[in-house]
Amino acid sequence: MSDDPVTRIVSPVERLRVEVLARIDRLESVSRGSPDLLPARVVAHVQDVGDVEGNLGDWLGERGSGRWIEGFRITPPQDVTPAELLYRVVVGPGQLSLWTPSGRFCGSEGLAQPLRGFCVRLQGAAAENYECSYAATFVDGSVAGLIPGGQLCAAATFAPLEAFQITLRPRAR
């Protein structure tokens, strides 16, 4: 190891950066080109950008941008009712929103406040027929990957959510 104090600091930081990028690459390779993803519209409101749209399975927000997500809305697939696909967001440590039925916005509409995490759950027929998972990146470089539906997705530091991906797949029978 070098005696240079800058090298002693930069080397661990660079190793961490490489590890984070490798995790993101693994997340992308798992979700890329999966023909069994169930399509549905997702709209996210991004700091200083506005609304961005995509489908379930797409990444929303820009990884590495430093811009946080302020809220989102999922329009469910045709065979899933709004009451069967619910989501909630983390607005701060120990501060969770109420469960929001799909089709409705969840977040800090008009307040420019960052989300610090989220959770998606299925119930009823949707839970019997589909499985949900998600991944996210945060403005501090934290990565959360392949979280099963119903579990909280947040950085240990409660850093603002920067980008996320939600997938919905038919259950294997």
Please describe what each predicted stretch is.
Residues M1-R173:
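Lectin-type carbohydrate-recognition ectodomains
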